[in-house]
Amino acid sequence: MAVGNINELPENILLELFIHIPARQLLLRCRPVCSLWRDLIDLVTLWKRKCLQEGFITEDWDQPVADWKIFYFLRSLQRNLLHNPCAEEGFEFWSLDVNGGDEWKVEDLSKDQRKEFPNDQVKKYFVTSYYTCLKSQVVDLKAEGYWEELMDTTRPDIEVKDWFAARPDCGSKYQLCVQLLSSAHAPLGTFQPDPVMIQQKSDAKWSEVSHTFSNYPPGVRYIWFQHGGVDTHYWAGWYGPRVTNSSITIGPPLP
């Protein structure tokens, strides 16, 4: 039987069509069309199936989800928000706030270091010198796709990670500071652990530091990430801590 109006189609057929439409078009173009489309597009079933279709969840997913629509968008946006975290582009995207001693430098991970590092995609690192070296990056959340209502109402978890290591022949100090900032760049949350002091003749293994911001105040618009350090023997050259594979991610943990 011919259908003269798309709304004469059974609701399950309409739902099947909506599943294959990009999410932003669903909300901006389809949802305002009529109350029937609005109600169908708001169904939990639709967004759960879109999550499954995109590989955001598995068939046996059993974790509670408060809002599948928000979950879908958070998962679709989820990526490392720090640019050039592993020095593949030199110092592109980084601000060299303090550039002491012989200044920041980029070095290659040696073959042995690559075997030890948990991510085989990492090939380079940043290294500090005999006077303090600090570099930073500011993440503009709106520019990265995280709209204001999402950040203020949902306030998704913000996870920060960094990797650092000393040289075996020289002591060093590593430091990290991450701040959640308002539109006026006022701090709304800070993670600043005590500096890590590494003694000379350490095992020089890579260590990870991580922190998750949860239940922070509304108004977060930027994230400021700064790390670096100094060697504690003041040797000319690049004997301070090495850093690489830094990351800032927003949203639920990956399955």
Swiss-Prot record:
InterPro entries tied to this protein: F-box-assoc_dom, F-box-like_dom_sf, F-box_dom, F-box_only, Galactose-bd-like_sf
Residue stretches making up the F-box domain: 3-50
GO terms of biological process kind: proteasomal protein catabolic process
Signal sequence residues: none
UniProt xrefs under Pfam families: F-box-like, FBA
Record key words, sorted: Ubl conjugation pathway
Positions of the FBA domain: 71-252
GO cellular component, one term: cytoplasm
Tissue: Expressed in brain, liver, pancreas and adipose tissue (at protein level). Widely expressed.
The protein's assembly and partners: Part of a SCF (SKP1-cullin-F-box) protein ligase complex. Interacts with SKP1 and CUL1.
Role of this protein: Substrate-recognition component of the SCF (SKP1-CUL1-F-box protein)-type E3 ubiquitin ligase complex.
Protein name: F-box only protein 44
Recorded name of the encoding gene: Fbxo44
